[in-house]
Design a protein with these regions (language model features):
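Oxyanion-binding/catalytic loops of NTP- or PPi-dependent enzymes
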Residues: 1-180
Length: 180
């Protein structure tokens, strides 16, 4: 989030570029506003921003030319990297290995392989994950079901953030018109 000096600097940069910056809005508001302008219908949005290391959930009401943020909730220590670590942890457990015995390089490569596995599962029913640890090659088969099982704690944390946003916004999931 921008602090005041960053907002002033952004407006000044816009002026230098010949653009009149009337207002600076946050990313969830911008996403909801962009979707709203596609339909021009009053809509209640749930903006689910799941980054590499953070989760932000916003409940945004768009009507006429107004955008109202009803609730914001988040977890600054929850993101896609947590799934990579869960996949890597499951891989190590399956092969009866412990992270503390891996070199930094081996663990970094394992995390990279876990991320590739996660990405592959977004379009494939299953994928193989291979890693060389201590000079030995290990391989595992991953499915979405396996990742769901190994990351159940992450899903529970995500649900808590979502429930908190809905409660703070005093809305039910059924009232949400669109998820961004």
């Amino acid at each position: 989030y921008f602090h005041d000096k960053q907002r002033v600097a952004t407006k000044r940069a816009g002026a230098l570029a010949g653009v009149m910056v009337k207002r600076i809005i946050n990313e969830p508001s911008a996403a909801a506003l962009a979707s709203y302008f596609d339909t021009r219908q009053e809509q209640l949005f749930l903006v689910f921003d799941f980054g590499g290391g953070t989760l932000d959930v916003s409940i945004v009401d768009c009507f006429d030319t107004m955008v109202e943020i009803l609730a914001v909730s988040g977890d600054n220590h929850l993101g896609g990297d947590d799934f990579n670590e869960a996949i890597a942890g499951g891989f190590l457990k399956e092969h009866q290995l412990q992270q503390k015995y891996l070199s930094e390089t081996e663990y970094a490569i394992l995390l990279r392989q876990a991320e590739k596995c996660k990405i592959a599962l977004s379009t494939l029913p299953e994928t193989k994950m291979t890693a060389v640890i201590g000079g030995q090659t290990y391989q595992s088969v991953y499915t979405n079901e396996r990742v769901m099982r190994e990351s159940s704690g992450i899903w529970k944390r995500m649900q808590r953030v979502l429930r908190h946003a809905l409660q703070d916004g005093r809305v039910s999931l059924e009232e949400i018109n669109a998820v961004i």
